[in-house]
Regions:
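A short beta-loop-alpha structural element at the N-terminal edge
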Residues: 5-17
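A short helix-loop-beta-strand connector motif used in the catalytic cores of GNAT acetyltransferases and
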Residues: 43-55
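Conserved active-site alpha-helix within GNAT-family acetyltransferase domains
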Residues: 99, 123-142
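Conserved GNAT-fold acetyl-CoA-binding loop/helix
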Residues: 18-44
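Conserved beta-strand in the GNAT
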Residues: 55, 61-70
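Conserved beta-strand-loop-alpha-helix junction that forms the acyl-donor binding cleft
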Residues: 119-128, 147-150
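Conserved GNAT acetyl-CoA-binding A-motif
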Residues: 110-120
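Conserved acetyl-CoA pyrophosphate-binding loop and the N-cap/start of the following alpha-helix
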Residues: 92, 96-104
Length: 159
């Protein structure tokens, strides 16, 4: 690992963030689902401030990113940190960058008095599952994620 830093994304990073999102979606075989644009990301991240992004750099070159936001746990009674995306370039995996990004987010969660940090992982993604388990993250075996999108969301809103 050369000179390594994790920094907050700036408005100038929007094209990079979108590129990382697309690379992650391609890896997850979900590129066809990405509809985000630079304009949408700019509005969401820097105008509405709905989420935050950190960029991992080695020798000044971007090697990965994490996008996260706060949710709330009624059970814990405190906000949590929800990791939406974590991505490290394939050529830079296994060098500690993913671990450094997770550690950085854990530090943010502790500094902000979050009760927990959570994320989802595709069930076929064994390398990521093994990585998360090696960081002492526990899978939520008894929970299933549900989602409403598109027409289903619009129809539900009408009822």
């Amino acid at each position: 690992m050369g000179r390594f830093v994790i920094r907050r994304a700036t408005e100038n990073d929007v094209p990079l963030v979108l590129d990382f999102i697309r690379k992650l979606a391609e890896y997850e075989k979900l590129l066809h689902e990405v509809v985000a644009t630079e304009e949408i990301l700019y509005q969401s991240l820097f105008v509405e401030k709905k989420a935050e992004v950190v960029i991992a750099e080695e020798e000044g070159n971007p090697v990965g990113f994490a996008l996260y936001f706060h949710n709330f746990s009624t059970f814990v009674g405190r906000k949590g940190l929800y990791l939406e995306d974590l991505f490290v370039l394939p050529s830079k995996r296994g060098l500690g960058y993913g671990k450094a990004l997770l550690k950085h987010l854990a530090q943010i969660a502790v500094e902000r008095n979050c009760g927990r940090m959570e994320w989802v992982c595709l069930d076929w993604n064994k390398s990521s599952i093994d990585f998360y388990k090696s960081m002492n993250a526990n899978p939520m075996e008894d929970w299933t994620i549900y989602r409403l999108t598109g027409e289903n969301l619009l129809n539900m809103a009408k009822k």
